[in-house]
Regions:
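FAD/FMN-dependent oxidoreductases across multiple families
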Residues: 196, 207, 217, 227-300, ...
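C-terminal helical "tail/cap" subdomain of flavin- and related membrane-associated enzymes
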Residues: 2-10, 87, 256, 300-301, ...
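Short helix-loop capping/hinge motifs at secondary-structure junctions, enriched
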Residues: 68, 194-199, 231-233, 253, ...
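Flavin-dependent oxidoreductases
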Residues: 184-214
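Short beta-strand micro-motifs enriched in acidic
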Residues: 136-139, 214-218
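Conserved mid-domain beta->alpha element of the FAD-binding
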Residues: 12-42, 160-161, 188, 265-357, ...
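Conserved N-terminal helical subregion
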Residues: 2-12, 29, 54-174, 178-191, ...
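Short phosphate-binding/catalytic loops that engage adenosine nucleotides
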Residues: 33, 66, 252
Length: 407
């Protein structure tokens, strides 16, 4: 492939049309790259459920001018916190305290809404659906990377591998790596109409199980659950019935949320995480991002957030397409330590949340109550160094500056 010139913009191929891949596509497009996104699915249908965007991801989106459209969808106002299955509060946390500490509130929205926002910033025809892709050449400083599709081969100055937890590109780059490990628990997610009675957003920790109920911007409710289970398990009847068995006697509004779900609308996925770091997040002209690079447990709500950060940092280091091979090591240097630190922190949080013995659970709950009495800031400290992250390069397209200094 010819080197990028004033007559030919650099070319990027993004493998995967999820949140991380689309964010990378927007960031590269705004840096004058010619971008093609290859998505295996036949359509970017409204699959998935809710996603929580913390202030760190919102600031990343500010770089591409999309932070404020996301903030406008904030539905969480007032208090929330952590409860036990009987409904007793273990700690209370307010949206105002979160915004004050980290420069913005947590924004819960449907993944399909975020995908629409990102797609609106891309030229028509950028995303090709029904387009499975195979990396056939990683490229180097003398030749292009090559991605092969059923319609032919595409040369690229940069390949962005955003192909998820089972990443085929990752296996090509690092065939000896063991990949993600089963975390010991499974998750369910569902979006339902709001219950008749108002509720306070919450996460509830039981014995080897948890439940969360959060409002969405469109008036619906996003609920998620997790429980210890063998890998690959499925309900003998349907997953809504399984949720009723496991959570039907928990505090309101949990039973009502489960009852309102359509059986076909309950999504179940086993949780895996990248226990062993990759040697790098790049090779040749190829860069990994999101779950393809650093799959993590959902216990900190940072999986999608870190993919968005990856995308912005990658575009920053890719620059205008000159010397991509020489620039990608800086992407690994910046992202690998941070993301693997969050992987480890999420794993520790998962261990705490999934305690199952009566005595350890009682001790855990007593400790959380004791710590929460010292004030909401104590609990929020667990997100210091995560939610207060600042993007590289130029700052915000939005007007609001964060109220805390970078850590």
């Amino acid at each position: 492939m010819d080197r990028p010139t004033s007559h030919r913009p650099p070319r990027a191929v993004v493998v995967g049309g999820g949140v991380g891949g689309l964010t990378a596509a927007v960031a590269l497009h705004q840096a004058d790259w010619h971008v093609t996104v290859l998505e295996r699915a036949e359509a970017l249908a409204p699959v998935g459920a809710g996603i929580g965007l913390a202030p760190n991801a919102q600031r990343a989106l500010d770089v591409i001018g999309l932070g404020d459209p996301v903030r406008e969808l904030a539905a969480w106002q007032g208090d929330g916190g952590l409860r036990d299955p009987a409904g007793r509060w273990l700690n209370r946390t307010g949206s105002a305290a979160t915004a004050e500490r980290f420069g913005g509130p947590l924004v819960l929205l449907h993944r399909a809404t975020l995908v629409r926002i990102l797609m609106s910033a891309l030229p028509a025809g950028t995303v090709r659906t029904g387009a499975p892709a195979e990396l056939t050449d990683t490229g180097d400083d003398r030749r292009a990377a090559v991605v092969t599709t059923p319609d032919g081969a595409l040369g690229a100055d940069l390949v962005v591998a955003a192909d998820g937890i089972g990443s085929a590109v990752r296996r090509v780059l690092f065939p000896g790596h063991p990949g993600p490990r089963y975390s010991g628990f499974t998750t369910w997610r569902v979006v339902v109409p709001a219950p008749d009675r108002p509720f306070t957003p919450h996460e509830t920790w039981g014995r080897g199980a948890l439940w969360g109920t959060q409002p969405l911007e469109d008036g619906r409710v996003y609920a998620y659950a997790a429980a210890l289970a063998p890998a690959g398990g499925r309900a003998p009847d349907d997953e809504r019935t399984e949720l009723l068995r496991r959570f039907g006697d928990w505090h309101d509004p949990v039973p009502g949320i489960v009852a309102a779900a359509e059986p076909a609308g309950v999504l179940r996925h086993d949780v895996h995480h990248m226990a062993e770091p990759l040697p790098a997040y790049h090779r040749g002209r190829v860069a990994l991002l999101g779950d393809a690079a650093h799959a993590m447990q959902p216990t900190l709500g940072q999986g999608g957030n870190q993919a968005i950060e990856d995308a912005i940092v990658l575009a920053h280091h890719a620059g205008r397409g000159h010397d991509v091979v020489g620039r990608l090591p800086a992407y690994t240097e910046e992202r690998l330590p941070r993301t693997m630190g969050i992987v480890r922190q999420a794993t520790r949080t998962g261990r705490l949340a999934m305690l199952s013995g009566a005595a350890p659970v009682a001790a855990r709950n007593a400790l959380i109550r004791a710590v929460s009495r010292l004030g909401p800031g104590i609990v929020l400290r667990g997100f210091d160094g995560i939610a207060d992250w600042q993007p590289p390069g130029r700052t915000y397209a939005a007007g609001a500056e964060p109220t805390t200094a970078p850590r």
